[in-house]
Amino acid sequence: MPEYRSKTSTYGRNMAGARALWRATGMKDDDFQKPIIAIANSFTQFVPGHVHLKDLGQLVAREIERLGGVAKEFNTIAVDDGIAMGHDGMLYSLPSREIIADSVEYMANAHCADALVCISNCDKITPGMLMASLRLNIPTVFVSGGPMEAGKTKLTDHKLDLVDAMVLAADPHASDEEVAAVERSACPTCGSCSGMFTANSMNCLTEALGLSLPGNGTVVATHSDRKQLFLNAGRTVIELCHRWYGNEDATALPRGIATFAAFENAITLDIAMGGSTNTILHLLAAAQEAEVPFTMQDIDRLSRNVPQLCKVAPNTQKYHIEDVHRAGGIFGILAELARGNLLHTDVATVHSKTLGEAIATWDIIGTQDEAVHTFYKAGPAGISTQVAFSQSTRWPSLDTDRTEGCIRDMEHAFSKEGGLAVLYGNIAQDGCVVKTAGVDASIHVFEGSALVYESQEAAVKGILSDEVQPGMIVVIRYEGPKGGPGMQEMLYPTSYLKSKGLGKQCALFTDGRFSGGTSGLSIGHASPEAAAGGAIGLIRDGDRIRIDIPQRAINVLISEEELASRRLEQHAIGWKPAQSRTRKVSSALKAYALLATSADKGAVRNKTLL
């Protein structure tokens, strides 16, 4: 049987010094025979999705200790993409994913931890910890801080979120008072932003991957039911330790759970729920860490066969994550996919022998278990707070309407093709991605003239000064992982297009990426990126570009000869922006750019250069 990794620093006379230091942390004689379980917390006061996590690591720790383990907590960094948005701070967001992954690996390996609990929540933290867990391949459980409650104001009938505040702020017809009212109401509680944005998308995907407990992605941060998720995470990691170190059960390890089939399940869920396009980037990165050959081609293949069964903000103003939970949460969607024979139900999870068994237990349509029904009635209280587990409000009933409800069955899908698609063409030879869930059907085929910007800042200025007109395709390049560096999110350009009434009259194409809050004909992750010699760098103002989502195609309508001629010309002068940019790029960002791959590889480090 495998030995505890921690024996390296706790066993034998030569480790007297290490044990002396362990004792100084509070360990006693009996503790040196127990598994040492690392708790990677991501508490910070900078991020609403993490502001309430300070004491939750110790909540898990006490449960681990009660069940016979030794718990040791440490913290990672966490960047708030919304606060970093629209200025040079966004250059640091995606690179922070690698820093988080490295820091978890460093702490777990330096101290020979036997297992891991990941307390994550927002955009790059869950992916970074996911990458680390698959590198380490020690028993691991994920538990997130949970989603924020949606906001409310007397000015609108629909619920609010961060994107509403951004769009209204750019609307010249909105008064300062209206903007202030929405600003104060859009983000009322702690938790990850309330729509199907990147953070919530990733926390939902950990359920499909099998690495977190049911409800991880959908129980609001303020609800008392989430406390039980944290306690259960402590219990589950102890069980996983027993299974691996006691029985050498490989399905207790992240790589035994997050197999190729599990990655297919995760992207199938992602497509069905219309998740953030960032999830594609992060799943590809995680697959590489797991040494699973999961690629853009697999995503393209699945996107053609999976319908959209759930539609949540920003793709509609009717539903937020709290509504998904009321409709049965992620297991509600997984159950419908399973009924459509679109899932691998024989894969393992941290909490059940197989995903199929878990669906049978947690599907609100199929089970009569009142405890499960009560669990999925956990709802928002509508009280502004930064305190976790501070309310116990329950919906009076579940949303079991699979015809017109938040979650649909296969027959009544929002669309027969899912919410994400991969496009290929002469300006995206290795692919690009679009969240079709947020694209009006009338512009699934769109042709327009290119208006090229060499940076997000220039594009924002152009949109706000009315350079962009109906029928144009805004091209923003040199914003990829290497070219940015850091692959900025383009939420401001897309929000401003909406505020100008151009959401259905223009498209945006970039080698950067989009916030989970983005909707509209916004196509990102163009690969190869411009800085890596990608053809997006060859587009010129006035070029006609044709986007055809049904055919999964995007092309600039010029001859191959002209494209080749432009390539030779560009190669001679170098793949860099035509206009200089006043952008401060630190040595840390330059180091990231030196190794960064394009988005089709997950924007991970190019290991061939190491």
UniProtKB/Swiss-Prot annotation:
Binding site residues for [2Fe-2S] cluster: C122, C193
Record EC number: 4.2.1.9
UniProt pathway annotation: Amino-acid biosynthesis; L-isoleucine biosynthesis; L-isoleucine from 2-oxobutanoate: step 3/4; Amino-acid biosynthesis; L-valine biosynthesis; L-valine from pyruvate: step 3/4
Modified residues (N6-carboxylysine): K124
Gene3D superfamilies, per database record: IlvD/EDD C-terminal domain-like
Sequence positions that bind Mg(2+): D81, D123, K124, E489
One example of a Gene Ontology biological process annotation: L-valine biosynthetic process
Residues making up the signal peptide according to the UniProt record: none
The record's free-text note on cofactor binding: Binds 1 [2Fe-2S] cluster per subunit. This cluster acts as a Lewis acid cofactor.
Keyword Lipid metabolism found: no
Keyword vocabulary terms for this entry: 2Fe-2S, Amino-acid biosynthesis, Branched-chain amino acid biosynthesis, Iron, Iron-sulfur, Lyase, Magnesium, Metal-binding
UniProt enzyme class: lyase
Protein origin, superkingdom: Bacteria
Catalytic activity: (2R)-2,3-dihydroxy-3-methylbutanoate = 3-methyl-2-oxobutanoate + H2O; (2R,3R)-2,3-dihydroxy-3-methylpentanoate = (S)-3-methyl-2-oxopentanoate + H2O
Active site: S515 (proton acceptor)
Molecular function as annotated in GO: 2 iron, 2 sulfur cluster binding; dihydroxy-acid dehydratase activity; magnesium ion binding
UniProt family annotation: Belongs to the IlvD/Edd family.
Function: Functions in the biosynthesis of branched-chain amino acids. Catalyzes the dehydration of (2R,3R)-2,3-dihydroxy-3-methylpentanoate (2,3-dihydroxy-3-methylvalerate) into 2-oxo-3-methylpentanoate (2-oxo-3-methylvalerate) and of (2R)-2,3-dihydroxy-3-methylbutanoate (2,3-dihydroxyisovalerate) into 2-oxo-3-methylbutanoate (2-oxoisovalerate), the penultimate precursor to L-isoleucine and L-valine, respectively.
Subunit composition and interactions: Homodimer.
Descriptive protein name: Dihydroxy-acid dehydratase
Native species: Xylella fastidiosa (strain 9a5c)
